[in-house]
Amino acid sequence: ECQRIVLAAGLANAELAPMVGLQQSLKPQKGQIIVTEKLDQQMALPSLLLRQTDEGGLMIGDSHEDTGFETSVRPNIVSGIADRALATLPALADVGVVRSWAALRVMSKDGYPIYDQSEAMPGAFAISCHSGVTLSAAHAFDLAGYIAEASLGQELDRFSQRRFNV
């Protein structure tokens, strides 16, 4: 027996949440990225298109595709990402690409996270969002504290699945 259980299983939360009395309306959205070789110079600020890793490589990507659960890399999409990156930062023309890949984002109907606590099982929570990169600090600090205290708090009500029940 445990006092808390957190469902944070990505798209599988749609199937798992009903087991604890919750609903998570989720759909997949494919995104593709390019990763460059490591760069000595650090970018001052991330953008919506470019982010630099601690190791120095750039993660470049801004694609949004509705392909169901299909995750193959499409050269025309990767080429478009590269073209937009070069238009934004022409110095990238001399930077090598190390790899590219596609993955699925976990999307709610409105694109915002879903944070819910079960009324049927008060220690059970379901957490779904599309960006571990931008929301990871909130999840690691703020959200973890709410879960530890067994209450998400009224300020997170706007992120409940209930917002779709109108």
Predicted regions and their residues:
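Short glycine-/acidic-enriched loop or helix-start segments at secondary-structure transitions
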Residues: 16-18, 45, 69-71, 136-137
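Mid-domain beta-loop-alpha active-site segment that forms a flexible
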Residues: 10-12, 77-84, 128-129, 133-135, ...
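Active-site lid/adjacent beta-loop-alpha segment flanking the redox-cofactor pocket in flavoenzymes
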Residues: 37-121
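General beta-strand recognition
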Residues: 1, 59, 125-126
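Glycine-rich, phosphate-binding/catalytic loops in enzymes
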Residues: 22-25, 77, 143
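C-terminal catalytic lobe of FAD-dependent flavoproteins
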Residues: 89-166
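Central helical "cap/lid" subdomain
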Residues: 2-42
